[in-house]
Each structure stands twice: as structure tokens, then as C-alpha cells.
Design a protein with these regions (language model features):
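Conserved cytosolic catalytic loops of P-type ATPases
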Residues: 30-47, 53, 190-283, 382-426, ...
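Juxtamembrane helix-loop transition segments at the membrane interface in multi-pass membrane proteins
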Residues: 133-141, 176-189, 362-381, 694-701
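Membrane-embedded alpha-helical bundles of multi-pass transporters
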Residues: 101-106, 131-132, 137, 149, ...
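Cytosolic catalytic headpiece
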Residues: 3-5, 32, 190-191, 381-598, ...
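Residue-level signature of catalytic and energy-coupling elements of molecular machines
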Residues: 15, 22, 59, 132, ...
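Actuator/coupling domain of P-type ATPases
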Residues: 57, 61-74, 80, 100, ...
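Bilayer-spanning, highly hydrophobic alpha-helical transmembrane segments
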Residues: 90-97, 305-334, 343-352, 356-364, ...
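Flexible metal-binding regulatory segments at protein termini and peripheral loops
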Residues: 1-111, 190, 205-207, 287, ...
Length: 701
């Protein structure tokens, strides 16, 4: 029997080091089989049996609170001066300044100044030293252990003031890091808070306010002007403009009428709407986005995996180097024990890997959160990194570069049948097809009649058309190529077809056993934004744009020239699109952009699969590496620029973290670096790295 898996939300998780220790403590619970801790989302997954009390005991060292995932947690705003850690930091500063005052007035340390410095160390560093000594007893060397050794070492050689300064600066930097990380986490918490927690439900002609968790499918909810929509559903009464920016990133409100779909978390701007609930609270689009974003933030990007491997060996190496500096010069070169012991302590402090360890995850978390708020769902750090390296983008045509709503433009009868009869015959077969062109024929036929001809033995011919039996005769609807496979076309028909295709229209033939009945032309309007977006892609480093389509060469070529695409590949079957993606890899990393439904194999084959219209289809959210929630390409250049910017920030962070350490280590040799300066270098690097990453929260990447 599989062990039970429970998911929890956390409060008070302040640093990556604390997260690692918390996870380690939980693993030591006998009844726990596996633990996954998502630091960016403050989320914990436990496989096995562990109570909330046991989990909170495992996180007691950092005051971590644990809540069931579905429980709504109300964040209490605690004033700065009321937080215990800030109170002890302020007390430590007062005692430190008093100690310096006494020391300065007496021309050096005396019992009173030492007592004040010691009090500053014990009050400001109580939590630090308690944790550090516990870790030291287990030979578990982390940041708190290194700092504790440094403070105790400073006291042992009589540098009480230095020890007190180290404690104070460490406390300040911890507070700044915690504040900055909370800011980064706001990208997720703001998503969670988008949808209302209650809704007005209509039952028996009366209005009741209920929690969204208690709503059922087919319940009818009322949304008044200015209110947020609480659940995904279908409009059954009223019409209004709805601002969908929270889900799709679109700034222009969308007019909703009877039968239209609406999403939880979007804003009803004008009229009153009655909406029939179509999804439970945990299945809404915003709930799925939150879940996928949290999973994405937990996934480690290649750069982060490298940094984690490096840090694993880095800390023990620093400990060994520190010990060697303390011992070798006095033993072999006649150096002073006190001087070299102090230098070893400084190396210990400088060597803390905090800034390095956090340099990548904080940038990834912030960038993915920013993208989600702008209507782009990036499903992992690896996809975020790879997007910035893309050199080739392949586009599906229908619904991606075009509007995806083709309309019948021409009907040509070449038999005794009328044009309406040709259309009706085609529609009677196409009503069983899922192809976008079939829907255009159906819409045209609906204007003529409500009843179609009865057909038998319908069969789809993949990528080419369909056939069925009508009144005892086998009738085909398909491409000119399918017709040519069965019978030659006359030169006059060939010219008619070519003329239509050169206008960017897709041609379908209707024929029976007696011969050709008619020709139907369909046109799908190119999106107004497609041309400008293609040009933007070239300016941000995309070298090649390719359209992959099952449409004919002439139509595809006309659209490709209109949009300025590098290359057009036409008359492709689904498996041929996959082969084409593979062949395009010779030019560099390839992204495939489609609707996430018909293009699933090609999306999976590309280095990065990008699906459009994620807000409207679960399939797009599931199949793609990146989902553009709006049904357009507007956010594609933004996504690529965000990826490139994130990579730059990560490299900057790593350079800052390592650069400051190298500089500090060089200053140790001549004895210019003091303990408090070492703390400033280490903690300053951490704060700079976090603040630098927070720049990714801006929309103008």
C-alpha cells in the first residue's frame, strides 16, 4: 500500500540554509518516507505519517509554522518593532554602542565594556549561537556553525567588540534577506489572493454568501459590477466587460455575453452577470496556474544544479583552509598564534556560501512569478533558461499566426449541383471532423439550413480530408492533392485552384464517384499583431522563423511572404512536423509555438514547446513547457527577453558572490580585513544578490 502524501504551506521559512535544515530534520522522523521542500513557494510535501506538531517541532529552530495546503492562511502584519528578532537586534545595537562608549572613555576595554559586549553577543546572537553549538556538536557545518565559531574565537582572543559587531551585522543581514525573500515570494502569494474566497450563490431565488470551497458544479453565482469572479464558469445571464489581465495578461477588457467562458480572479467591470459554475475551486484555471508555477519554482535549473554541487564541496574546503591558516604559519614560519588564529576566523566568515547558494533560485523564483502575473506560465527553471538560448522559432499557422477562425470565401460549382448543394454536401461530411476548416464550412452551412444530409461510414483521411456515403454514393471532401491521387485535374481547374491559393486561400474539393462537384475556398485572416511580433523576434536575437502547416504550398507561401518569415514548410502531416523540428536543430535551439492540441508531438520534440490560449484549454497547460495564457503572440517577445534578462541576473549574482569573496580573501593576507568587515562582505553579498534578483519583478524587462 502506497504511503500517504500530504502537502502543507509554511510560514517563517527565512533562508535556504534553514530550508535545508528543516528538510533534514523532517527526514529524521521515523514514519516519514520522503520529503520535498519548495523554498520559493514555501510549500512542503511529506510522504508518510507526520503530524503538524511533529513538523513544527522540526522547524522550531526557525519558528516555522505549518498549515494544510487547502487551509486559507491569513497573514498577520506584525509591526517591525514588535518582531522578536528585530527587538533583540536593536537591543544588541544599544549594548554594542554602550560598550564602545565605555571603551573609548576609558582608553580601552575594562570589565564594564566587556560585559556590555558580551551582553550584546548573548542577546543579539542567542538564536544563532544556540543553533550553531547544536550543529557543532553534530559536526554539521553550516552558516550558523561558521558564524558561531567566529564569534567564540573572537571572544577567546579578547576581541569582544569584534564578536559583538559580527553578531549585530549578522542579525541585520538576516532581517534584510528575510524581507527580500518575502518580496520575491509575493509573486506567488499575489496569485493565490487573486480569486475571492467567497461567492454569492443563487438558491431558491435568494442570495447566499458561501466559501468557494463549498460551491458545486452547476451552482449559479451572481457577480455584481466591480466584483471579482470567484469561479470558472459559463455566463447564463447578463453581459459585461471583464478584465482578464490577472489570467491572460491582456490589458483590454473582453466583452462577455451568454454562453461565454469566464475565469476565477478576473474583474467584472460593468454589468451584472449570472454564471454557472463549471469547475470546482481546486480545478479553476488560476488554481492550476498556481500549482504549475509552484512546481516550476521547485524545479532546479541547470545553473542552480551546478551551483548546488559546487557549494556541497565549497563549505568543507573553507573549513580546512581556515584551519590550515590558523596552524601552518605559526608552526612552520614562526607566525604569531593570535594573529593567524584571527586571520583563520576571518576566512571562516568570508567563506560562508549564502550568497552563492541563493544566487540562482531567488532569480528563478522571481522571474517565474513575474511571468505568471503577466499571463505567461513557465513550467520550470530549465525552460526559463533554454528560452533565452532559442535561435529558431517554428510556428503552426492556423490559430497561431492566423486568427484560427477561417471563413468560406468562394464556392464554385462545376457540376449540375448548385453552390448551396455543394456546400451542404461538404458540411454533411465535415460535421464529424475536428479540423478548423471543417468548422468554417459548418458555419457557412448553418446560414442556409438547420438540417444536414444523413451520411454513413464517415472516415477521416489524416491531413488530407474525409469521406462518407451519401445517398448510396461515396463522396469525398479534401485537398487538391487527395483528388489528384484518385484522378487527374484538368488544366482549367488547376489554374482556378492556383489563383485562389495565391490569394492566401485554402482550397477544398468536393467530388463523388461521378466526378468533381465543386470547389470551396476558405481564408483564415492573419492576426494583425503577427507581422510586428515577427519583426520584434528578429530584433531580440531570433535568427530564423519558420511556419509549419498542413496547408498547400501556394497558400502557405503567400502568408509567409506577408509576415516576413524566413522559411515556410507546407503540406506537412503531424509526424512530418516532428521531423522538421528535428532538422531545424542544426541551426540552434528550437522553439515550437502552437495551440497545444494538434501540435502536441511537435511541441514535445522542440527544445521549448510554447502553447497559446492556455486560459481556455487544459491541454495547453499540460502539454507545453510554456503557456501563453492569452490567445495571441503578444507575450512571446516578452518571454524571450525575460529569459535573457534572468540569465544575465544569475551571472551577475554569481559574479558578485564570488567576486566579493575573492576580494575579501586577498585583503586577509596583509591583515587589512577585520571580522566585522568579513561579515559585511559576506552578508552584503547576500543582500545585493537578493535585491539584484528582485529587479526581475519589473514588467519592463
Amino acid at each position: 500500500m502506497a504511503a500517504e502524501k500530504n502537502v502543507y504551506r509554511l510560514q517563517g521559512l527565512t533562508c535556504t540554509n534553514c530550508a535545508a535544515k528543516f528538510e533534514k530534520n523532517i527526514r529524521q522522523i521515523d514514519t516519514v518516507e520522503d520529503v520535498q521542500l519548495n523554498f520559493g513557494a514555501s510549500k512542503l510535501t511529506v510522504t508518510g505519517d507526520a503530524s503538524i506538531l511533529q513538523l513544527e517541532e522540526a522547524g522550531a529552530f526557525d519558528g516555522i509554522k505549518v498549515f494544510p495546503e487547502k487551509q486559507r492562511v491569513i497573514k498577520q502584519h506584525i509591526p517591525f518593532w514588535k518582531k522578536r528578532e528585530n527587538q533583540t537586534t536593536i537591543a544588541s545595537l544599544i549594548l554594542l554602542l554602550a560598550g564602545y562608549g565605555v571603551s573609548t572613555s576609558n582608553g580601552g576595554n575594562n570589565w564594564l565594556s566587556i560585559a556590555l559586549f558580551l551582553a550584546a553577543i548573548l542577546i543579539g546572537g542567542y538564536s544563532l549561537m544556540k543553533e550553531g553549538l547544536r550543529n557543532l556538536s553534530k559536526l554539521d557545518f553550516d552558516m550558523s556553525t561558521l558564524m558561531t565559531i567566529a564569534v567564540i574565537g573572537a571572544a577567546l582572543i579578547g576581541d569582544w567588540a569584534e564578536g559583538a559587531v559580527v553578531v549585530f551585522l549578522f542579525s541585520v543581514s538576516e532581517a534584510l534577506e528575510s524581507y527580500s525573500i518575502d518580496k520575491a515570494r509575493n509573486s506567488i502569494s499575489s496569485l493565490i489572493d487573486i480569486a475571492p474566497s467567497t461567492a454569492i450563490v443563487l438558491r431558491g431565488g435568494k442570495e447566499f454568501e458561501v466559501d468557494v470551497e463549498n460551491l458545486q458544479i452547476n451552482d449559479v453565482i451572481l457577480i455584481k459590477p466591480g466584483q471579482k469572479i470567484a469561479m470558472d464558469g459559463e455566463v447564463i445571464q447578463g453581459d459585461s466587460s471583464v478584465n482578464q489581465a490577472a489570467i491572460t495578461g491582456e490589458s483590454v477588457p473582453v466583452h462577455k455575453v451568454l454562453g461565454d467562458e469566464v475565469f476565477a480572479g478576473t474583474l467584472n467591470e460593468e454589468g451584472s452577470l449570472q454564471v454557472r459554475v463549471t469547475k470546482l475551486a481546486e480545478d479553476t484555471t488560476i488554481a492550476k496556474i498556481i500549482h504549475l508555477v509552484e512546481e516550476a519554482q521547485a524545479e532546479k535549473a541547470p545553473t542552480q544544479q551546478f551551483v548546488d554541487r559546487f557549494a556541497k564541496y565549497y563549505t568543507p574546503a573553507i573549513l580546512v583552509i581556515s584551519l590550515l591558516i590558523m596552524v601552518i604559519p605559526p608552526l612552520t614560519m614562526g607566525g604569531l598564534w593570535g594573529e593567524w588564529f584571527y586571520k583563520g576566523l576571518v576566512v571562516l566568515v568570508v567563506g560562508c556560501p549564502c550568497a552563492l547558494v541563493i544566487s540562482t533560485p531567488i532569480a528563478i523564483v522571481t522571474a517565474i512569478g513575474n511571468a505568471a502575473r503577466n499571463g505567461v506560465l513557465i513550467k520550470g527553471g530549465i525552460h526559463l533558461e533554454e528560452t533565452g538560448q532559442i535561435k529558431v522559432i517554428a510556428f503552426d499557422k492556423t490559430g497561431t499566426l492566423t486568427e484560427g477562425r477561417p471563413e468560406v470565401t468562394d464556392i464554385i460549382s462545376v457540376s449540375s449541383m448548385t453552390e448551396d448543394e455543394v456546400l451542404l454536401q461538404a458540411a454533411s461530411i465535415e460535421k464529424f471532423s475536428q479540423h478548423p476548416l471543417a468548422s468554417s464550412i459548418m458555419r457557412a452551412a448553418e446560414k442556409l439550413t438547420d438540417s444536414l444530409i444523413e451520411v454513413e461510414n464517415f472516415q477521416s483521411i489524416t491531413g488530407k480530408g474525409a469521406k462518407a456515403v451519401i445517398d448510396g454514393q461515396l463522396v469525398h471532401v479534401g485537398s487538391p492533392n487527395l483528388y489528384r491521387e484518385m484522378s487527374p485535374l484538368g488544366s482549367s481547374f488547376e489554374q482556378q485552384i492556383l489563383d485562389l491559393q495565391q490569394q492566401g486561400k485554402t482550397v477544398m474539393m468536393v467530388w463523388s464517384e461521378k466526378g468533381l462537384n465543386g470547389i470551396i475556398a476558405v481564408a483564415d485572416q492573419v492576426r494583425k499583431s503577427s507581422l510586428s511580433i515577427i519583426q520584434k523576434l528578429y530584433t531580440i536575437g531570433i535568427e530564423k522563423t519558420v511556419m509549419l502547416t498542413g496547408d498547400n504550398h501556394s497558400t502557405a507561401k503567400a502568408i509567409g511572404q506577408q509576415l516576413g518569415l524566413s522559411e515556410v514548410k507546407a503540406e506537412l502531416l503531424p509526424h512530418e512536423k516532428v521531423q522538421m523540428i528535428k532538422s531545424l536543430r542544426q541551426y540552434g535551439k528550437v522553439a515550437m509555438v502552437g495551440d497545444g492540441v494538434n501540435d502536441a508531438p511537435a511541441l514535445a520534440t522542440a527544445n521549448v514547446g510554447i502553447a497559446m490560449g492556455g486560459a481556455g484549454t487544459d491541454t495547453a497547460l499540460e502539454t507545453a513547457d510554456i503557456a501563453l495564457m492569452a490567445d495571441d503572440l503578444e507575450k512571446l517577445p516578452y518571454t524571450i527577453k525575460l529569459s535573457k534578462r534572468t540569465k544575465q541576473v544569475i551571472l551577475q549574482n554569481i559574479s558578485i558572490a564570488l567576486g566579493l569573496k575573492v576580494l575579501a580573501l586577498l585583503l586577509i593576507i596583509p591583515g587589512w580585513l577585520t571580522l566585522w568587515m568579513a561579515v559585511m562582505a559576506d552578508m552584503g553579498a547576500t543582500v545585493i544578490v537578493v535585491l539584484n534578483s528582485l529587479r526581475l519583478m519589473r514588467n519592463n524587462v
